[in-house]
Amino acid sequence: MSPPSSGTDRSRELGRPSDTRAAGVAERFDDASGPVDDLEYGVVTPPVLVIGAGAAGARVAIELAESGVDPLVIGKRDHGDAHTTWAAGGVNAALGSLDEADDWTIHAADTLNEGHHLNDPEAVELTAREMPARIRELDEWGMDLDRTADGKINQRYFGAQSYRRTCFVGDRTGEAMLETLIDRAQELEVPYRENVMITRLLSDGERVSGAVGFDVESGRGLVFRSNHVVLAAGGFSAVYERHSSRDDENNGDAQALALEAGASLLDLEFVQFHPTGMVGERYGEEWDGRLVTEAVRGEGGRLYNAEGERFMERYSPDQMELDARDVVARAIGREIEDGRGTEYGGVYLDISHRDGDYVRERLPRMVERFESLGVDITEEPIEVAPTAHYTMGGVDVDFRTGETGVDGLYAVGETVAGVHGANRLGGNSLAETVAIGKLVGEHVADALEAGDTDPELTDDQRAVTEREFQALESLADADGDVAPRTLLAALRELMWDHAGILRDEDELRDGLERLAALRERTADLGVAGDRTSKSFEYAVDLSFSLTVAETMLQMALERTESRGAHHRTDYPETDKEWRTNLVVSAEDGELAIRRRGVGEPSRSVQEALEEGYELDYHHLE
């Protein structure tokens, strides 16, 4: 069995519209051709352009459509084949189905605690307060949520949470959520354009009013002229060698585009390394870093080192395997580094002590995946190691509106920073997409001026368009000796070596030096093929990844403490003076980093923080 790819079979499985319906919807935004030297490009004029077709982008588009606005959603892959589908274990909402004492204030308090209080408190409270309604909405739209015997929406344990609040569909929750959102979007006839890669936002220095890109199948250039642009294109975990994303997603597209357009980025030094990624040397390199859902531990899975010791008893005797992800990931990393890992460079995750039928019911995708690799997880352990999984840092926004500070540009989902602080609570990523996605959609609909978008490009926009297409054409014609994929691999190795789970000043500075050398090698880039080739896509990804990786290294060097997912071995303690966000902007071609104070939670959430809740996970034994 191979990892899922971006084939049409998977797209149909996830609810891709029929060709007839898709064609009818697409007619709303006709292409007009215009010359750029010898190139031809299409001009598409939706009032709102949503860049990114995962759960966040879909939820924004649904809200816009329900408000009478005609958005256009574009994605890099086939319709339905977004990174959301890899979020397996669940989505948080304080429903109290099993633990009636749970409520949104405790959800918010847990989120702030696990974010080490670098979160935007308002963003946290908006998410926690919205989620019960958003889950019930998804349920009404047909999401096949697991139920208790008495018909309530079921909830499971996830790490570092005071109560059982993670709603789920087996171990395919993200896939089920995206299917549901796509179905709802299709009911509203939301237009969608697949296999489009955006390379630049249309900006005159004061306002963003569209984007430039190309169709990855035909190579044709595309200009999107819009009143408002929403970035919902994910994070940048794929700048690491071991990552849970696919190689052509989460390369930092959205963050690099926003930075170039004048927006600020926040907290890029915080990258979540999920404790349990697959070990490539054991299962095949194509599986290296792929996620083993936290639901395995949530259902009672235990971690053992090669000596047979259940080592989390030493690191976290109370919460054990269900401590926060940063704690468990560092513990696994330490076991491997100290020589107690397996021969393949991992540790063992074992759920074979649970009833086999129960495991098959609750974790069907994990059972199927490992069976295809000759492993029965109901009978034997699997081998896991940390993997770059999620980026807490991203675009700096006002969460009430999605505004970035650049007129016409909004952002949402993993693209942004603020909800998760220094470490993300499992189950909160899917929660943020729909909770904040709805709010952003509402605001953009309210902000949209009446009338259609002017299909004519301004002189400034036309100049930006021409420069960008000429740059893309030059990139496609590059005939040097270094393949883009080679440099991408070198960058990912660099980031794993110098900015991974454990960091120090020397490693970070060495990483910046190696990155500068990589930039110099791009002068000898050779792209095999035209704009329809994977080599060309890798070259574009490389440009985004270099920008974001350099920014992340600089911010990690700036933060001289350890907090959450950012662990400096030369500054191993958390420093109360560093309870501050780092904000970066591009000024005259240079990165400018500044500090910004963190807000305080509301009185009700502060009371929940002071109360303190701690669940005894030992009943899972």
Enumerate the predicted regions with their spans.
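Conserved N-terminal glycine-rich FAD pyrophosphate-binding loop of Rossmann-like flavoproteins
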Residues: 77-110, 116, 276, 283-288
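N-terminal Rossmann-fold NAD(P) dinucleotide-binding loop
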Residues: 57
